[in-house]
Design a protein with these regions (language model features):
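N-terminal pre-domains immediately preceding structured catalytic cores
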Residues: 2-621
Length: 621
């Protein structure tokens, strides 16, 4: 971001506001007797500490322990407490990013540009959200801006490309002032380049979980019209929800019934996460358990509205969540929850079109991933039904080095999830176009290898979590595990998920992939295999220069025992072409498309060829 340095300096000073009314901490009722254990946990009801409980006794008393600490990570990113396995490679980075501590140099160039990682599966720590809630200077700045020109727009203009009209100019001027309030732009009386306004708008959208091409669409205009304290409160509820999901071992979010609930009468996610998939609600679908549990936790802590939440942080003094675990009463978990659950997965490919993109028809039924659990009564419950992706036409280098289009298919049939890889690395196949492996430094204007794409990290082509699709075949010497390169994995290419296309893999929103992995490790027997320390270097040539992409390790592996059964259904093949096209075809002439303009200014997403695994790259060294 152009104002990244100023932004980080401003944020670093905000937690001091938490000390404003620290003297009121004595008003919190204290129990007469502390339980006999070394680390008793505070029990909260209706915003008041009503007692303390030993962690071991909490389940007996119907209480759930929720870790609100600033060094929290999801279950999938934790390692066993032993001296055998190396630490998870991405854990410390995750904690720093959640606290908006962005690395210096090239390592931090991507997160500094993204500014807010809420949209990409790394929810801010409570310290960060509390500082936002208590930032009265920012709230007052927003309230003083007349944003009526934004709300009266008849179109959804994009700052970097929009045709200049009086209405658009007035709207962009108001937007500029609001983004200065957000400290995403420096205050300036000079005329600002429109690409800077574009970058700042995209960062604002990421902050509020808005999936957009960086345009002033209706959803963004609604957010800009909202009170900033309300938006910060929704961010607080999203962070709390992640902690509740982890603490209670939940995943059931209502998607199997096509109904996501609200929390304190609020829809706290962007519209894209409530979009329909064209499928009917499932009779065997689990109800939304996540939203009621999150609301129960919020009410227990007294976080019922922005003012009440702000008062909580003021009352508890500076850095209240540096180390904080609380005990609250949540709705009971379903009876089918267990340490080892009988689970299976079904991936419905939905409507499949093999025609070239320009000739493809409408996708009415989008691909979905459904996780089932078998109950003690031998019935099945659909826990979630999430949007995912299947194959499509993607760019690839042909045999003579020319760029063309090839259809990347998603395998159909029964597979197994055995290997669950956290913070995975992506190994570029030989046919990956070089342009997909570089990005341009905005400051220096030079091309450098895109190490973020390889991982580990939220911007990896595989996201934060990957599950390998294996086909097990029994041979004379035991089981042979065939890997055709298909994975279920996280991604920050959210537009591809909404448009249902990938390079053959089944993509999930980054935060959903983390939830899935954490649920599997919580409710499925597994072995911790640990760090996959197999270094690799990918060499390629870009514009006459030889470049190297080092891959120091390939992720942190867990082995599910037994593996989870996965069935990929064929879906419904539409159009005249009924079989998978095998040949590579010439690139069609470029056509104007809304996403083309956005791609010029949006942060780089996992590029073309990100899942091609037809031939493993040659090892170096």
């Amino acid at each position: 971001m152009p104002a990244a340095a100023d932004t980080q300096a401003d944020r670093a000073s905000r937690p001091a506001a938490l000390a404003a009314d620290a003297g009121e901490a004595s008003a919190v009722p204290q129990p007469a007797e502390a339980p006999e254990c070394s680390s008793p946990v505070a029990v909260f009801e209706a915003g008041v500490e009503v007692g303390r409980v030993c962690p071991a006794d909490a389940p007996r008393d119907g209480l759930t322990l929720i870790d609100l600490s600033d060094d929290w990570v999801p279950g999938a990113l934790r390692e066993p407490d032993d001296a055998v396995h190396l630490p998870q490679p991405y854990r410390s980075a995750y904690v720093k990013l959640a606290n908006e501590e962005f690395p210096a140099g090239l390592e931090g160039e991507r997160p500094r540009r993204d500014a807010f990682l809420d949209l990409y599966g790394i929810f801010p720590s409570l310290q960060v959200v509390a500082a936002r809630l208590l930032d009265e200077e920012r709230h007052a700045c927003h309230a003083a801006v007349d944003a009526s020109a934004i709300q009266t727009l008849a179109t959804s203009p994009q700052p970097s490309t929009a045709q200049v009209t009086p209405a658009v100019t007035a709207a962009f001027a108001a937007l500029d002032r609001l983004l200065v309030c957000e400290r995403l732009l420096p205050a300036s009386t000079r005329r600002r380049p429109r690409w800077r306004l574009q970058e700042a708008l995209e960062a604002y959208q990421r902050k509020h979980m808005i999936v957009s091409y960086g345009v002033l669409d209706r959803e963004t205009r609604r957010a800009l019209e909202q009170d900033t304290r309300e938006l910060d409160f929704r961010a607080l509820l999203r962070t709390l929800r992640a902690r509740v999901i982890d603490a209670a071992g939940l995943i059931e979010d209502g998607t199997a019934r096509a109904v996501r609930g609200t929390i304190l009468s609020r829809q706290i996610d962007g519209d894209a996460f409530h979009a329909g998939d064209g499928h009917e609600p499932m009779e065997e679908g689990a109800p939304d358990l996540v939203s009621p549990a999150t609301e129960a936790a919020a009410r227990a802590l007294g976080w019922t509205d922005p003012a009440a939440a702000a008062e909580f942080f003021l009352r508890h003094g500076p850095a209240p969540t540096r180390r904080l675990t609380v005990a609250v009463r949540l709705p009971p978990a379903p009876a089918y929850h267990d340490e080892h659950m009988d689970l299976r997965v079904e991936i419905d490919r939905g409507d499949v079109w093999y025609e070239l993109p320009a000739r493809r028809g409408r996708v009415a039924h989008h691909p979905t991933l459904t996780l089932y659990a078998r109950t003690s009564g031998d019935e099945e419950v659909a826990l979630v039904r999430w949007p995912t992706t299947i194959g499509g036409w993607k760019k690839e280098l042909g045999p003579k080095g020319k760029l063309g289009l090839r259809y990347k298919n998603s395998d159909v049939g029964k597979r197994l999830w055995r290997d669950l890889i956290v913070s995975p690395a992506w190994l570029p196949p030989l046919e990956t176009p070089p342009r997909a492996l570089v990005h341009r430094l905005s400051a220096a204007g030079k091309w450098i290898p895109d190490t973020d794409l390889l991982g580990p990290g939220y911007a990896s082509a595989y996201g934060l979590v990957m599950l390998v699709h294996h086909r097990a075949v029994e041979g004379a010497d035991g089981t042979v595990w065939y890997d055709n390169g298909i994975r279920t994995h996280g991604s920050l290419s959210y537009h591809s998920i909404l448009e249902s296309e990938s390079h053959g893999c089944h993509r999930l929103f980054n935060h959903a992939a983390v939830q899935l992995a954490s649920f599997l490790l919580r409710h499925r027997n597994h072995l911790t295999r640990g760090l996959m320390a197999r270094p690799f270097v990918h060499e390629f040539t870009w514009r006459g220069t030889k470049l190297k992409l080092p891959i120091p390790q390939r992720g942190y592996r867990f082995e599910l025992t037994p593996p989870v059964e996965v069935e990929v259904l064929p879906g419904t093949v539409r159009g005249k072409i009924q079989r998978v096209p095998l040949r590579i075809v010439k690139l069609p002439r470029p056509q104007a498309h809304a996403s083309d303009a956005a791609a010029k200014v949006a942060p780089p997403l996992p590029p073309e060829g990100s899942e091609v695994q037809a031939a493993p790259p040659k090892q170096s060294g």
